[in-house]
Amino acid sequence: HEKIKILDIFRHENKLRIGHLKGNNFFIRLKKVSKPAAKILENVLRTIDKNGFANYFGYQRFGKFGDNARVGEEILRGKNSIKNPKLRDFFISAYQSEIFNRWLSRRVEISKFAHEFNKKEFAKIYPNLSEIYGDLRSENGIFSIIRGDVMGHYPFGKCFLCENLGDEQVRFAKRDIVPTGIIAGAKTLFCDGICGQIEREFLPDDEILAKMNGSRRFAWCYLENLKFNYDEENAHFMMSFYLPKGSYATVVLEEILHTRLRDYAPNLAE
């Protein structure tokens, strides 16, 4: 493609395989940005750089028409037959991604409501979570971890259950660990307690779970090496940052712009 530039080519003694990638460097240029808007962008980027962001799967994961997840579920339930194994796995992966995104949206909402409403108001929205209201409010961040959460060492490392909430809150604040969300399937570590109840709301029945390979994915992520600059003469706002593998720059853009990029997808490459 004429808009793709290959910066360098070199040999390596090992072949590149799935899992070898550590992360990606991104450069993004926004056009027609006014000076006041650039100031807002700078402040939003500083906030994201400080607090991190919810590590959703980007809209690209779900296909041009946003129906890949539906096709994946149909395959698992025997309502759609696709013989190509790679294509079949692709659609099932989109279904797993949708489950993760829905769960993550709920957890972000729970954390937000715990800080915006008093205990009585919160209990009306989430009566089964009223007993952990104090724990949810004990954190200053945007995402509150819960006893029974499956935590992961960040940016690489094993997963474990959160048992000592106070200690893990400190480690989360230091970016040593982050909460993880489930990639639905068999043979994975599930959340425990109330946290597990929330997780199970989004999971299919055991028969469907057994047909998928499960794992965990970081629910929270951080920008690295963030740089940004405003070119007032051309009204361009440039930013660059690094993300670990599996994280989407488009998700960061949606967080910055507070809009769904899917609505603008045909014009993003222009």
Tell what function each PLM region has.
Residues 1-270:
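Non-catalytic, substrate/partner-engaging modules appended to enzymatic cores
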